[in-house]
Amino acid sequence: MFQDNPLLAQLKQQLHSQTPRAEGVVKATEKGFGFLEVDAQKSYFIPPPQMKKVMHGDRIVAVIHTEKERESAEPEELIEPFLTRFVGKVQGKNDRLSIVPDHPLLKDAIPCRAARGVQHEFKEGDWAVAEMRRHPLKGDRSFYADLTQYITFADDHFVPWWVTLARHNLEKEAPNGVATEMLDEGLERQDLTALNFVTIDSASTEDMDDALYAEELADGRLQLTVAIADPTAWIAEGSKLDNTAKIRAFTNYLPGFNIPMLPRELSDDLCSLRANEVRPALACRMIIAADGTIDDDIAFFAATIESKAKLAYDNVSDWLENNGTWQPENEDIAQQIRLLHRICLSRSEWRHHHALVFKDRPDYRFVLGEKGEVLDIVAEPRRIANRIVEESMIAANLCAARVLRDKLGFGIYNVHTGFDPANADALAALLKTHGLHVDAEEVLTLEGFCKLRRELDAQPSGFLDSRIRRFQSFAEISTEPGPHFGLGLEAYATWTSPIRKYGDMINHRLLKAVIKGEAIARPQEDITQQMAERRRLNRMAERDVGDWLYARFLNDKAGTNTRFAAEIIDVSRGGMRVRLVDNGAIAFIPAPFLHAVRDELVCSQENGTVQIKGETVYKVTDVIDVTIAEVRMETRSIIARPAA
C-alpha cells in the first residue's frame, strides 16, 4: 500500500535533501580508519567498516552523521576513483589471484584475474599492470581488477626500470624503423668538411647533436658556427618515423640507460656527428663582440660537416685548468678549445649583466653493475667544458628564437613568465620583511625580474630565494614567441637537440622554410600539450627509478652511524625533507626525530623553518649532518635523523 505513495516519496526526498553531505578526498591511515578531507581546514572521520567501501585518494560524496557531538562520514557516491590503471604485485596463484597496488598508502590486496587476451599465467610476486573493474560505491560487492599486462617476475634485477616505465605507460625500447636515404629537400648545402668542427660531450655519449667551430676575425671579434645534427634530412614530416617521434616527444634518459625518440641507427649513427664522418647538418653562424653581444647579422644555412674530434668534458676541463695528462691531438684542435673558451667567457659575462645565469648544481650519475645493482653514485660538477657547450647552445637558441620570431612570427618556444601576477603583492610583502623593496608591478616585467634575481643571488644564503620559489609560474612550451624570465631572455627557442627533442625537429623544419624563403604552417597547439605531458611523465619516471636505486644504495647504511651532509629542501607539518649533498638522495626526517616534545616544536612550511621553544633551529637551505634511520624498500623511502 505504501509502494507508490507520493507522500512517502516526498518525505524520503525531504529527508535526503536535509541530510548533511560533504564532498572530498579520502585519506587512508595505517590504522584502518580514514578521513574525508573537504579542504585544508575541514575533515571528517571515516570509521574502519566504512573505509572498506573506499580507497585512499577516492573523491566521494559522503553523508555526515553526528553522534554525541562527534561527526563521521558514510561514503555514499563515487565522484572520481583514485585507481583506474595501476601497477602492482600479484599474490596467490591460478584461479585465486589478487594484486597489491604499488603505492605507499594502498596496502590491501584487490581480487583480480587476467583480462581476456592476456596469455601470461600469473604467479606470486609477478609485477603487472591492472585496471579497476568494480567499486563498492558503484553498486558492486567489492573491489575487483583485471590484469591487463604482465611486466616482469619478482626477482628481475631490472624491476625498477620495467615497473616505472609500465606505471607511466612509457615505451621500453627504441622505436623500430629505418631511414634508407636522405630526402631531397631542395636545400643548397655549404661544404664545411674542411673546417675543424669538434664535439664536446660525456665520454659515453653516442648521440652527438652539436659540433662547434670558432674563428677570430680580423677586427678581433669571434665568429661561432654551431652545426646541429639533421634528422629531418632523413625523416619526412607525417611519416611513420615522424609520428613515432611526435608521440615520444623526447628521448627518455633514465639512470643507467636511455630510450631514444628515434631509432638507434639514426640517433647513434646516421645523424650523430661522429668524428671523421661526413654528416648533413643545420648550421647557425653568428659574430660575437668582445663584450659578448651577438651581432644582428645571424645566418642559418644547411651544411655538410665532418667533426675532427670527439672531445670529453673532463678532458677539456682538465686541459684548460692545466691538470691531468690529456692533450688535444693537434694544434688545430687546441686552438678550437682556446677560442671556444674565450666565447664562453664573453657570453657568460654578457648574460651576467644582461640576462640571468643559473647557479651550478652537480649532476648525479648512477654507476650500475651488470645486474642493475648500484655500485656508486657520483656527483659530477658542471665544469668549464660543460659551460662552453652550454653558452654556445644558449647563444644558438637565442638566434633561432629571434629569426623565427622576425621571419615567421611563430615556432616552438620555451616561455617562462616569472611570477604569477596574482602573487605579486604577497611576494613584495614577503621580500619587504627581509629588507628587500620591490615594486609589485615592476617585478612582473623581464627587467624587474632580472633585477630581483641578481639581488637574490647576492644574498649570503639561498634562504630567501627558496621562500619566493612558490610564487613563480612554470615554464611552458608555446608556438607564440614570448620571454623566458628564468634565463632572462626576450625569447628562447631550442633547435640544438633534434635527435632527442621533437620540438627541436619542428624548429628545424621551420628554419629550413626560412632558409628557402618558403611559407610554412604554424605548428598545431596540441603538439605543445603532448610535449609538456611527455616531459612531465619522463621526469616522474626518472625520479621514480632514482628513488628505487637510492633506496637500494643506502639500504645497508640504515641504523648505522655513517654521517651524510644534507641540505634542507622543504619543511612540512610532519617534518623536513633533505637532499644528501654527496649523492642527491632525498630523505625525510619525521618531526619526532627533531624534538621529542611535540608542543614545543613548530614546523612551518610557510616560513620554511623549524622552531623549538620559539627558537629557529633549522631552516630551508641549511646543511646539516644526518644518519640513515631506516630505508623502506616497499615504498622506496629513506628516513633520516639529525646526527647526534
UniProtKB/Swiss-Prot annotation:
Entry similarity comment: Belongs to the RNR ribonuclease family. RNase II subfamily.
GO (cellular component) term, any one: cytosol
Function: Involved in mRNA degradation. Hydrolyzes single-stranded polyribonucleotides processively in the 3' to 5' direction.
EC class (word): hydrolase
Gene field: rnb
Reaction it catalyzes: Exonucleolytic cleavage in the 3'- to 5'-direction to yield nucleoside 5'-phosphates
Listed PROSITE patterns: RIBONUCLEASE_II (PS01175)
Top-level taxon of origin: Bacteria
Protein name as catalogued: Exoribonuclease 2
Domain S1 motif: 561-643
SUPFAM superfamilies: Nucleic acid-binding proteins (SSF50249)
EC number: 3.1.13.1
Main location: cytoplasm
Cross-referenced InterPro entries: CSD (IPR011129), NA-bd_OB-fold (IPR012340), RNase_B_OB_dom (IPR013223), RNase_II (IPR011804), RNase_II/R (IPR001900), RNase_II/R_CS (IPR022966), RNase_II/RNase_R (IPR004476), RNR_Ribonuclease (IPR050180)
Organism placement in taxonomy: Bacteria, Pseudomonadati, Pseudomonadota, Gammaproteobacteria, Enterobacterales
Entry keyword Secreted: no
One of the GO BP terms on file: mRNA catabolic process
An annotated Gene Ontology molecular function: RNA binding
Domain RNB residues, every copy: 189-516
